[in-house]
């Protein structure tokens, strides 16, 4: 036994971390506090005046002098100074987790362990949401903090009014993240000692840990929340995954906005990027930085993806309301500032028909600009829906004309996706360039130098303006670095190979997905059990299916019941409308542009593997009918492409067994699909 009587040093080759003479004095203050509001060695922390520690915390620009927060810190500082005696290591208070837009109460580095500690002041029980929260913090460090990839992380939840601990067990998952320990205050020290006794390994390099890069890949909802809360600039840098690409592009767009404002210019920018590079993130950054209605450079992000707009607006509105309540302020009834800078493009377009006035926004961002309608599609819509005959503009022409009503200056930012099929009635990005060339010579064009690539289908149109006045090609308007999910970078290639019936390529790509589990099953209950087991913390899981999957009803999957994407994506585990309940299935229309961590992809007879290729079907009346139109076949194939690429961390594919007694669901409709997927190498759940 060690002289301190706490640790059996024979079991710990790295020595006793309770009474050893290890020193962290050589860690510079800059490193210590780079991600935390306060950082010091445990010895320095214990000897410091509590008022001086509180003063350092209160100096942070994000500090909010809420009475409850102040009281919590005072209590936590006193508690930690008392309970960390004879322990050596590093301590951080209010450690920032940018992806989640929040901070960990305490991070402790002792021996081979990173302890992630969260207090729930005044709580007598261990709420599931609180357990998930501290678990999420540990998972975030494990996945995105480089020096935490190979270390043991132990989350500890302290309910300050609890009388008994809920869980003192040490249970680790394969990646070294332990299940949260749930303790009352008197059990905190024992939990630390128990973990140090039972977790072996080399001591942490505490300097390296402090210096290590944090490289998160946020979902679009997480990114929007952080950008809105932090007003853009700093938050977007946190998401840059160690690359300068996003920051450089965002800075260039800000320069063009300022130049247009100062010099009374009208500018249209075309931003390109590889799939998953963060084009929408840049658009959100512009919109959130210029979100205030009284800002002369007020901006709006426009998207034709209705569910995406609804989910983003609801997420930001909920966060803003929570922030106000935390500060003791009451949200204004009926007020929704988020609506001012994230809108559906069709609502924006409709405003242009109401009067001759310019839009309220001088900066307008069009997401997926290549999906704007052609002149024929726009004219047909205007005639049928708006009673406007003989409409002569394409949607790009009409939208530019609306923004051009500003007499002084304006900026349009077109976010351009490449490599995507142009659907019926969509004009492609070339229509925007052509509209400026033919109708708006007073507008200058700043074009990504990559817009000439074949995947953007604009080469011919770009050629007509290449030497024109007021046309500038800019390398900084291309995002070259993918920010796809940390586990899912090869998933799109795998799905493409599966859908293109390239078996060998699919097998090879599947072998690269060693951190992205994929399974198939004929049993829906097994699929549900699988995602519930795989998910940790608040990782979201959900049930998804094709909008043409009409014969999953015997499995209680009825896609005709419209799922509300706001509740499905944002609500918690106790809400029956949330994805967690695995009762409501979302279709490709509700999930496009959004993600879950774990998905159950339900496969129906609308898209069947047959022989050496796919068979396409639409359920009409009481039977399946063949889909012969090539365009509609492509829609169906792309629906499954969307479904199979929605999960960030893994998925299980549910292929029903069918029913010989049901002519709409014979086993033959499903067996060949299941066999094809199994032959590729996807593991089978039995």
What do these predicted regions represent?
Residues 2-217:
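Accessory nucleic-acid engagement/destabilization modules that flank
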Residues 91-102, 333-355, 547, 572-606:
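Conserved helicase core region in the C-terminal RecA-like lobe
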Residues 238-267:
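N-terminal pre-P-loop "Q-motif" helix
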Residues 271:
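Hydrophobic anchor at the beta1->P-loop junction of P-loop NTPases
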Residues 283, 453-464, 475-595, 599-605:
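Conserved helicase/translocase motor-coupling segment
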Residues 334-403, 583-586:
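Conserved RecA-like ASCE ATPase "motif II neighborhood" in helicase/translocase motors
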Residues 411, 581-686:
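C-terminal accessory regions
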């Amino acid at each position: 036994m060690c002289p301190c009587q706490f640790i059996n040093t024979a079991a710990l080759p790295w020595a006793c971390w309770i009474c050893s003479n290890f020193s962290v004095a050589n860690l510079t203050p800059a490193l210590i506090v780079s991600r935390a509001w306060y950082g010091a060695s445990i010895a320095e922390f214990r000897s410091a005046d509590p008022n001086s520690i509180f003063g350092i915390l209160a100096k942070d620009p994000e500090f909010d002098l809420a009475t409850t927060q102040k009281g919590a810190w005072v209590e936590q500082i006193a508690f930690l100074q008392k309970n960390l005696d004879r322990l050596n290591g590093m301590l951080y208070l209010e450690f920032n987790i940018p992806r989640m837009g929040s901070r960990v109460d305490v991070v402790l580095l002792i021996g081979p362990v990173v302890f992630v500690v969260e207090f729930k002041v005044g709580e007598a029980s261990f709420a599931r949401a609180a357990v998930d929260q501290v678990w999420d913090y540990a998972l975030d460090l494990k996945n995105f903090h480089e020096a935490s990839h190979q270390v043991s992380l132990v989350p500890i939840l302290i309910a300050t009014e609890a009388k008994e601990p809920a869980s003192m067990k040490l249970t680790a998952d394969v990646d070294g993240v332990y299940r949260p320990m749930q303790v009352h205050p008197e059990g905190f020290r024992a939990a630390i000692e128990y973990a140090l006794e039972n977790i072996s390994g080399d001591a942490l390099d505490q300097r390296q840990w402090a210096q290590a890069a944090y490289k998160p890949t946020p979902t679009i909802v997480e990114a929007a929340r952080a950008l809105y809360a932090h007003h853009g600039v700093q938050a977007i840098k946190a998401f840059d995954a160690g690359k300068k690409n996003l920051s450089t592009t965002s800075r260039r767009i800000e320069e063009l906005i300022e130049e247009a404002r100062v010099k009374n210019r009208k500018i249209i920018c075309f931003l390109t990027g590889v799939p998953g590079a963060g084009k929408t993130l840049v658009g959100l950054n512009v919109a959130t930085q210029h979100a205030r209605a009284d800002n002369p450079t007020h901006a709006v992000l426009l998207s034709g993806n209705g569910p995406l707009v609804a989910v983003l607006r609801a997420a930001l509105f909920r966060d803003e309301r929570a922030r106000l309540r935390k500060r003791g302020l009451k949200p204004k009834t009926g007020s929704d500032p988020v609506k001012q800078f994230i809108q559906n493009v069709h609502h924006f377009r409709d405003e242009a028909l109401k009067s001759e006035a310019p839009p309220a926004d001088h900066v307008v961002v069009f997401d997926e600009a290549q999906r704007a309608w052609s002149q024929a599609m726009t004219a047909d819509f205007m005639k049928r829906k708006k009673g406007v005959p003989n409409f002569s503009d394409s949607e790009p022409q009409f939208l530019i004309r609306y923004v051009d009503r500003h007499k002084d200056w304006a900026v349009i930012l077109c976010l351009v996706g490449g490599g995507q099929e142009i659907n019926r009635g969509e004009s492609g990005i070339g229509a925007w360039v052509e509209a400026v060339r033919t109708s708006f010579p007073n507008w200058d064009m700043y074009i990504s130098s990559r817009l000439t690539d074949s995947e953007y289908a604009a080469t011919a149109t770009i050629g007509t303006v290449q030497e024109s006045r007021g046309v500038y090609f800019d390398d900084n308007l291309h995002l070259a670095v993918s920010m796809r999910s940390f586990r899912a970078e090869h998933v799109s290639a795998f799905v493409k190979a599966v859908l293109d019936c390239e078996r060998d390529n699919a097998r090879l790509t599947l072998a690269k997905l060693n951190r992205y589990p994929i399974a198939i099953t004929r049993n829906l209950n097994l699929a549900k059990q699988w995602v519930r087991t795989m998910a940790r913390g608040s990782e979201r899981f959900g049930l998804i299916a094709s909008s043409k999957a009409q014969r999953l009803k015997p499995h209680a999957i009825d896609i005709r019941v419209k799922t509300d994407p706001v509740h499905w994506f944002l609500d918690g585990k106790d809400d029956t409308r949330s994805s967690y309940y695995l009762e409501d299935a979302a279709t490709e229309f509700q999930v496009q542009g959004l993600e879950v961590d774990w998905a159950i992809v339900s496969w129906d007879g609308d898209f069947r593997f047959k022989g050496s290729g796919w068979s396409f079907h639409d359920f009409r009346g009481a039977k399946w009918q063949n889909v012969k139109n090539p365009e509609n076949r492509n829609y169906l194939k792309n629906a499954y492409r969307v479904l199979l690429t929605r999960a960030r961390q893994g998925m299980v594919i549910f292929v029903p067994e069918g029913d010989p007694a049901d002519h709409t669901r014979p086993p033959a409709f499903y067996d060949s699909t299941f066999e094809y997927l199994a032959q590729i190498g996807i593991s089978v759940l039995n």
